[in-house]
Design a protein with these regions (language model features):
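Active-site acidic/histidine proton-transfer and metal-coordination neighborhood
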Residues: 1-71, 168
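Histidine-acidic metal/acid-base catalytic patches
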Residues: 22-25, 54-183
Length: 183
């Protein structure tokens, strides 16, 4: 189950993180028989939304009693809009090092793949077709060919246009497949 963590709604980030951790504990208490992992999605940081800093997620994991039942869904547009560069390679590596330090790479369980209509650090959540936005192609090439992520599910989350004469999901998937390097 993938969910955005929530917002602090004028109570401040620390109070919001505490409330989210408590809410997750309550869900796990009430649904202790369920075997579903909750994946918190990295957010762009619009308004008072939490989860746009890797540290937010790390703090939620530290404060909840059930961190073993939580993981992360990494949304490429959201992370970029939140200020995490995914290219060039040196910045990509630095972003993943920070992710590992603050959250733990083992907590990464899925990706939402999409480009961004807005720039790095804009904190605006506007998805774009792969290679057609501010991210471009290179971050997707790096992610798709990173052996750490080879077995993780990756969900295409690009815009759906009404009345489009061609299948943009097919176009986006072809673009992504073309980036895979054979070993």
């Amino acid at each position: 189950l993938v969910a955005h963590p929530g917002a602090h709604v004028k109570t401040g980030e620390e109070a919001g993180i505490k409330r989210i951790a408590h809410g997750l504990d309550e869900i796990h208490r009430r649904c202790s028989d369920f075997k579903v992992m909750i994946l918190l999605e990295i957010t762009a940081g619009q308004g008072s939304t939490l989860g746009y800093k890797f540290d937010h997620m790390g703090q939620i994991f530290k404060q909840t009693k059930h961190a073993d039942k939580l993981g992360i869904c990494f949304d490429t547009c959201h992370a970029f809009a939140a200020g995490y560069p995914l290219f060039p390679k040196v910045d990509y590596d630095a972003t993943w090092q920070e992710f590992d330090t603050l959250i733990g790479i083992n907590k990464l369980k899925a990706f939402h793949l999409n480009d961004s209509k807005k720039g790095l650090g804009s904190r605006v959540d506007r998805h774009e077709h792969i290679g057609k936005g501010a991210l471009g192609i290179e971050p997707f090439r790096l992610i798709l060919n990173d052996p750490r992520f080879a077995n993780l599910p990756m969900v295409l989350e690009t815009p759906k246009e009404e009345g489009d004469n061609h299948d943009m999901d097919g176009v986006n998937l072809t673009t992504l497949r073309d980036l895979l390097q054979s070993n």
